[in-house]
Amino acid sequence: MLDRETSRDDVAVQTIHVMQGAYVASDDPNIVYTTILGSCVCTCMCDPIARVGGINHFLLPYAGVTKVENLRYGYHAIEILINSLLKLGANRHRLEAKLFGGGSMTLQLGAVGPANAVFAQKYLRDESINCVARSLGGTRARKIRFHPTSGRVQQMFLTEIEQLPPESPRVRLRRGAGEVTYFDCDANSDPAAFGKEMR
């Protein structure tokens, strides 16, 4: 399910919110995808030469013993995202991925977030897809803005919906990995308002 809205930053840009269990892909430079993550993981993927990209939002790595083709599960969500990009003209060998989410949000969710993060990284390694940036783990929710044709990502941490004691999220970026922007958002901030970019 997708929610659409017009960006307040640029009326020419269409913002599409990606819900849990969904994926989208596009070659339209006027589209920006957003999603909010807790224990879920999203894969932002782009072919920077063909200028096509897409994003998914999955809840669990696997469906268990039964293989169910459902976008809530990482193995299917990443596979279908790759296929959708290839249909738009991407070259599999040029695909670049960025991973976000996988937080430990509540005790009830246990190791769901870390399991999602481990799965996504292993899947990309096994498929020989270059993971150029990642921000995984921690205890805070994240809001992501992804520009599919450039691969540019903005990330904002949402402290107002924390459910566990604060802890610095584990963030790892490769040198020269492309552009990822990080923001902190306190309890009095508007989660939809992204501040100045930090480089």
Swiss-Prot record:
Which keywords annotate this record?
A: Chemotaxis, Hydrolase
Q: Name one GO biological process term.
A: chemotaxis
Q: Has the keyword Phosphoprotein been applied to this entry?
A: no
Pfam families, per this entry? CheD (PF03975)
| CDD domains cross-referenced by the UniProt entry | CheD
Q: What does this protein do?
A: Probably deamidates glutamine residues to glutamate on methyl-accepting chemotaxis receptors (MCPs), playing an important role in chemotaxis.
- Name it: Probable chemoreceptor glutamine deamidase CheD
Q: Which organism is it from?
A: Cereibacter sphaeroides (strain ATCC 17025 / ATH 2.4.3)
UniProt lists the gene as: cheD
